[in-house]
């Protein structure tokens, strides 16, 4: 917003809640502090979140595909404070307590605190619905996260006062209707397990800007090219995030999975030009998400082949392994 203030042709209106979009008459209706207000538009780029009013208007206009899938899990944020000003765990690590169907994670903050998130089913014996009293909460943490509990002096107060939130994946298509386009969570809300929600929305901005450079003043071409480029990648990062939830809560505690990851890391280290992990492609490159998803699947197949054929001892034999990796790309 600070940058936008330098442009005289940009106006900002606060306390304007979008209520409806009239596509036929190209009008928007807002709820303001002074009552309802209707404005005409020439084009709209809607980034109004996972429960988008603009998307809702598109849903009711017909020929619009939409799905909203909730995980059976919710999440609650907790806190590990510093002790005598010092962090109580390694500040250069993501800490995970995998427990199969649920998990606790902790992320470091600059002030030496850790933001912890408990991902837990709503229902079941070990579900949020059964953790209502102090005794139940204490027993649960003593059973599953006793070492983390020792670092949480405010556990009970935070557990009772902090909300339990939902985890939802939103998919829809088309993102475009006439002079209107959806962007960000409004078009592709995802669960947080790859840490890519904000980044995927920023990628929307980059691609839309590219298409504006190519096709303006033809907004139809801009919007069509934008959604054609972004839709497959939005679906891919949604799938990747769901896959990573299973990996984080369950697979990181499986010895076979960890052995596969050990081989994968070795390949990444020895052959960085030929082998990049899915995580590296998603997090540290501009590789489109759908390509990263496909390459990750190929990587898994390749590592499993190495294990099945007992080729681990050949990983450092450069001629053999470079040839082996090259065959993957044929």
Describe the role of every protein-language-model region.
Residues 52, 135, 203-206, 257, ...:
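A structural signal for well-ordered alpha-helical segments within the folded catalytic domains
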Residues 5, 16-20, 25-167, 171-172, ...:
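Conserved FAD-binding catalytic core of PHBH/FMO-like flavoproteins
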Residues 1, 138-142, 227, 264:
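Non-transmembrane alpha-helical segments in soluble domains
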Residues 1-11:
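N-terminal Rossmann-like dinucleotide/flavin-binding domain of flavoprotein oxidoreductases
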Residues 45, 78, 161-253:
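Conserved mid-domain beta->alpha element of the FAD-binding
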Residues 8-10, 149-152, 216-217:
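Surface-exposed helix-capping loop/turn segments at secondary-structure junctions
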Residues 210-330:
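C-terminal helical "tail/cap" subdomain of flavin- and related membrane-associated enzymes
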């Amino acid at each position: 917003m600070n940058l936008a203030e330098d442009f005289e042709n940009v106006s900002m209106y606060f306390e304007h809640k979008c209520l409806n979009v009239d596509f036929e008459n190209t009008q928007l209706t807002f709820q303001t502090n002074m009552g309802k207000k209707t404005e005409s538009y020439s084009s709209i780029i809607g980034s109004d979140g996972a429960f988008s009013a603009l998307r809702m208007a598109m849903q009711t206009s017909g020929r619009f595909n939409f799905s909203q899938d909730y995980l059976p899990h919710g999440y609650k944020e907790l806190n590990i404070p510093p002790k005598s000003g010092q962090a109580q765990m390694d500040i250069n690590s993501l800490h995970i307590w995998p427990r199969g169907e649920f998990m606790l994670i902790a992320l470091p903050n600059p002030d030496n605190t850790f933001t912890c998130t408990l991902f837990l089913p709503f229902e079941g014996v070990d579900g949020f619905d059964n953790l209502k009293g102090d005794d139940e909460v204490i027993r649960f943490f003593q059973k599953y996260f006793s070492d983390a509990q020792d670092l949480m002096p405010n556990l009970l107060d935070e557990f009772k006062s902090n909300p339990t939130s939902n985890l939802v994946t939103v998919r829809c298509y088309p993102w475009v209707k006439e002079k209107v386009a959806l962007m960000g969570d409004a078009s592709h809300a995802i669960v947080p397990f790859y840490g890519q929600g904000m980044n995927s929305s920023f990628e929307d901005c980059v691609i839309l800007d590219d298409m504006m450079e190519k096709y303006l003043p033809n907004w139809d071409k801009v919007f069509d090219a934008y959604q054609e480029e972004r839709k497959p990648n939005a679906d891919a990062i949604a799938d990747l995030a769901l896959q990573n939830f299973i990996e984080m809560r369950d697979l990181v505690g499986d010895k076979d999975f960890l052995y596969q990851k050990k081989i994968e890391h070795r390949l990444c280290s020895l052959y960085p030009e030929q082998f990049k992990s899915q995580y590296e492609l998603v997090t540290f490159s501009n590789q489109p998400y759908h390509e990263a998803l496909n390459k990750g699947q190929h990587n898994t197949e390749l590592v499993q082949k190495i294990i099945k054929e007992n080729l681990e001892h050949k990983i450092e034999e450069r001629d053999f392994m470079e040839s082996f990796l090259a065959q993957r790309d044929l």
